[in-house]
Amino acid sequence: MEKSFDYDVIIIGTGPGGEGAAMNLAKRQKKVAIIERYHQVGGGCTHWGTIPSKALRQSVSRLIEYNSNPLFNQNEQVKQLTFQDILSHASAVIQKQVSLRSGFYNRNRVEHIQGQASFIDAHTISISHPDGSVEKISAKQIMIATGSRPYRPDDIDFDHPRVYDSDSILSLKHAPQHVIIYGAGVIGSEYASIFRGLGVKVDLINTRERLLSFLDTEMSDSLSYHLWNSGVVIRHGEEIERVESSEDAVIVHLKSGKKMRADCLLFANGRTGNTADLNLAAAGLKADGRGQLKVNDCYQTEVDNIFAVGDVIGYPSLASAAFDQGRIAASAMVDSSSKAKLIVDIPTGIYTIPEISSVGKTEQELTEAKIPYEVGRAQFKHLARAQISNNLVGSLKILFHRETKEILGIHCFGENAAEIIHIGQAIMQQTNGGNTIEYFVETTFNYPTMAEAFRVAALNGLNRLF
């Protein structure tokens, strides 16, 4: 006789991965409970990561646009905003997202339970509620979608009011004139753009020799130049030795012997999977040193009935990918396998100012693989739409095979790059000869549009062939 359970599936975490799984399972008529320890749904993506940082960036971008446009700024009186000023917009967006996502669970009859989840065994979860009560629920299958949190080294005092990570920075109570950002990855680079756009002095400490070294070199160089040109001081190849703090300042001592003083420190160097409080051992699981879980192609852990998706399994650690992982894993939970797979070329969007987006191979990767490629480029400053909107900084680069004309990679730098990239991505996904740069020459684009950059870049690249 088959054992009875309270639910078909319990999902731990309401971020993109948990949501994607819950919606798919609900559509398949499964009884689903989703557990969230925070008092609102949405996970780190909605409350501390993707949504608030992009909302902050949007406000700063519009501020920069206003101050740099003579049509609006005829008296040369610079409009100034503080970090607290723009937080109100981010908070409003967060609440809209919470309302929207709460509606998803209600309409699809997914039971939302607030509390801290931990394993009792591979089928049973203990939930500690905010009021101190504890309940136990069980399910045939369980999904871990708990996301990640900022890495906090033990020797840095994050309780100090002038030391922040990428979560706590959203609770900034003062108006810093100078900020040190340690870690020049995606998060650090985005916040460097935000603070500098507000007129705050920024020291960006990079532990590597290049900014965002996974990007195409031209994109990385473009970002470095524009951050430098805006006044951000970038220090490459540096590591923190210790942090000295006072009531209203921090002094960062580097292993190279340098030291810097600022109003506050934003530590943005690495993230850790949220598994420490789950009592994984009771379920027969063990996380690695970064708090992450290993899974197979169907997102199944080494315990057959337990699956994991999103940041808690590591790469690619993108909200977009997490949602798809949840959806794919849900299919595997129901059908024992899933025909759908995460696409190979996942687009990357980095919301610096200007923003960056890419899909496919970089020039470095193609050169190393000895693939005969050609390059097509379009400069935004030559596009009528860019001239109209006064967003002249940026470019689009298409990498394609010289012989087959197959598109191998697309890299974009500039306003709306993360939107523009999807036009190229759609063509790259075509099969049976549909993936060709000639598509952009043969189709008709609306005029004037930023999308026209694809036609310009395609013509530029094809004209290089001989």
From Swiss-Prot:
Q: What is its EC number?
A: 1.6.1.1
Catalytic reactions of this protein: NAD(+) + NADPH = NADH + NADP(+)
Task: Write down the top EC class of this protein.
Answer: oxidoreductase
Coiled-coil ranges from the UniProt annotation: none
One example of a Gene Ontology biological process annotation? 2-oxoglutarate metabolic process
InterPro entries given for it? Class-I_Pyr_Nuc-Dis_Oxidored (IPR050151), FAD/NAD-bd_sf (IPR036188), FAD/NAD-binding_dom (IPR023753), FAD/NAD-linked_Rdtase_dimer_sf (IPR016156), Pyr_nuc-diS_OxRdtase (IPR001100), Pyr_nucl-diS_OxRdtase_dimer (IPR004099), STH_gammaproteobact (IPR022962)
- Which cofactors does this protein require? FAD
Which UniProt keywords are listed? Cytoplasm, FAD, Flavoprotein, NAD, NADP, Oxidoreductase
CC cofactor note: Binds 1 FAD per subunit.
Indicate where this protein resides in the cell: Cytoplasm
Cite the Pfam families for this sequence.
Pyr_redox_2, Pyr_redox_dim
Q: Its family?
A: Belongs to the class-I pyridine nucleotide-disulfide oxidoreductase family.
Function according to Swiss-Prot or TrEMBL: Conversion of NADPH, generated by peripheral catabolic pathways, to NADH, which can enter the respiratory chain for energy generation.
Protein name listed in UniProt:
Soluble pyridine nucleotide transhydrogenase
Q: Which organism is it from?
A: Colwellia psychrerythraea (strain 34H / ATCC BAA-681) (Vibrio psychroerythus)
Q: What is the lineage of its organism?
A: Bacteria, Pseudomonadati, Pseudomonadota, Gammaproteobacteria, Alteromonadales
Annotated gene: sthA
